[in-house]
Amino acid sequence: MPKYRSATTTHGRNMAGARALWRATGMTDADFGKPIIAVVNSFTQFVPGHVHLRDLGKLVAEQIEAAGGVAKEFNTIAVDDGIAMGHGGMLYSLPSRELIADSVEYMVNAHCADAMVCISNCDKITPGMLMASLRLNIPVIFVSGGPMEAGKTKLSDQIIKLDLVDAMIQGADPKVSDSQSDQVERSACPTCGSCSGMFTANSMNCLTEALGLSQPGNGSLLATHADRKQLFLNAGKRIVELTKRYYEQDDESALPRNIASKAAFENAMTLDIAMGGSTNTVLHLLAAAQEAEIDFTMSDIDKLSRKVPQLCKVAPSTQKYHMEDVHRAGGVIGILGELDRAGLLNRDVKNVLGLTLPQTLEQYDIVVTQDDAVKNMFRAGPAGIRTTQAFSQDCRWDTLDDDRSNGCIRSLEHAYSKDGGLAVLYGNFAENGCIVKTAGVDDSILKFTGPAKVYESQDDAVEAILGGKVVAGDVVVIRYEGPKGGPGMQEMLYPTSFLKSMGLGKACALITDGRFSGGTSGLSIGHVSPEAASGGSIGLIEDGDLIAIDIPNRGIQLQVSDAELAARREAQEARGDKAWTPKNRERQVSFALRAYASLATSADKGAVRDKSKLGG
């Protein structure tokens, strides 16, 4: 029988000092035999996805106390990728994931907490907390802040849906008037919550649901809706049950590594491919799998991508549907239901509620459930009122979207595409693979060949695009922006958005060893591995080289002879300590970022730290 971790600090005469300090936090004699549960919050006023979380930690804590636990809350940092985008701030985004994971480990282990409730929401916060949870392997439940409502505005006598990406594209489009750009900007992000499309934040919150570590509805129920409050109340109660199951009944099925098993990781990736999730999810799932000591690699993702169809299409891949529409169609469980009927899921998995996949689908899949309360929950919709308050409205759709032929979520028979929404490509400058969000690629450019325009920073590429130096047919190559080379593996949302602004969204390709925002669409290929700074062949591409992209056949090829590449590699190595570094880039890199870069691996490894360098 495992011993409560917290007993280390609450029992025994030699822990009198620790108990004295616990008493100063409000604990009493009656509390010293109870499980201490960390409420890991991420409230900040910097991030719309987190601005409403201040009081939600208290809400969870009250339920933990009522159920017989002791709740202790702490906060992590949270970077807003959208605000950090397009300047030096983006260098800090991906490294913040490791910082969040480490800080959770530090707090939980330093104070010997027994379990956690993770209140996350946005891009690097959910992955960081997920990595920490699987590293620590103590009972955990995730409950995120929820998606933002889609923006809406009237243009050309028509009401259209909007999101952050629309504001960026229109702001850079010289053909758009100042007044229209301002109108879109003011309408794009109307409420608290994670940005309203299938961007990285919402993708990751959907994946924690598929992994079994959060409750049904977590990935899609709007931040503003009153129904979301129940997820927080349930999380506080349920974590005490899970904690007691493990420590008092020796039930290891309550632990996250036994819930988020390899089978669950495969299900999560299957969901990701089917819903056309952000390419960043690949990076984060690979990193989380390593923390769980699960053998889950790019090869597994490649195999899944070849057999899973696209069953859901959401912004930025279409403007018709946003997360509020996914929820109306049944949310994550709705997509999993269609995947299960297609025979594409591992059924022998359980979630934090203790339900198997078949049990979860029977109760929560709107196509089959007989539970009116569940159907009512999935009718939760937007109010269209600007707010930063959680649970501030209770509007509902008149009907559910259970049309699996023409609705937001489709059946296998009526799939948007036989091929899934993500694909892994391999070739002579991406020997370890690269990722493309096929859900956002127009059919006309699934095969594309063009001359390279090479840039050694995102800034130079943006200047060239907006300056008219990139023309139709070009393949923009941005290198030395990987985890080590950036450092920090910047997102390339500005270059891809500005290609659209310049009318080149379907006329050019963009390839990088950096990564893309979940808001990116178009022929945008990222995570090229190995990265240039690690000696990857993307560092050998020269202006004018032809690059052939073949998504249907999963290929990407630099049309240069092996002999020429060998000669270029020899010349690169001859640069000595300047080899595999940018030739003309002025960038101030802080000590903190240099420390991150010294241990960073390429994207095919999840951009995690190289343990071999630390002897571990």
Swiss-Prot record:
It is an enzyme of class 4 (lyase). Belongs to the IlvD/Edd family. Keywords: 2Fe-2S, Amino-acid biosynthesis, Branched-chain amino acid biosynthesis, Iron, Iron-sulfur, Lyase, Magnesium, Metal-binding. One of its GO terms (biological process) is L-valine biosynthetic process. This is Dihydroxy-acid dehydratase. The gene is ilvD. One of its GO terms (molecular function) is magnesium ion binding. Homodimer. Its cofactor is [2Fe-2S] cluster; Mg(2+). Mg(2+) binds at D81, D123, K124, E491. Functions in the biosynthesis of branched-chain amino acids. Catalyzes the dehydration of (2R,3R)-2,3-dihydroxy-3-methylpentanoate (2,3-dihydroxy-3-methylvalerate) into 2-oxo-3-methylpentanoate (2-oxo-3-methylvalerate) and of (2R)-2,3-dihydroxy-3-methylbutanoate (2,3-dihydroxyisovalerate) into 2-oxo-3-methylbutanoate (2-oxoisovalerate), the penultimate precursor to L-isoleucine and L-valine, respectively. Pathway: Amino-acid biosynthesis; L-isoleucine biosynthesis; L-isoleucine from 2-oxobutanoate: step 3/4; Amino-acid biosynthesis; L-valine biosynthesis; L-valine from pyruvate: step 3/4. [2Fe-2S] cluster binds at C122, C195. GO terms for cellular component: cytosol. The active site is at S517. Signal peptide: none annotated. NCBIfam families: ilvD, PRK12448.1. Binds 1 [2Fe-2S] cluster per subunit. This cluster acts as a Lewis acid cofactor. Pfam families: ILV_EDD_C (PF24877), ILVD_EDD_N (PF00920). Its EC number is 4.2.1.9. The modification N6-carboxylysine is found at K124. It catalyses: (2R)-2,3-dihydroxy-3-methylbutanoate = 3-methyl-2-oxobutanoate + H2O; (2R,3R)-2,3-dihydroxy-3-methylpentanoate = (S)-3-methyl-2-oxopentanoate + H2O. It comes from the Bacteria.
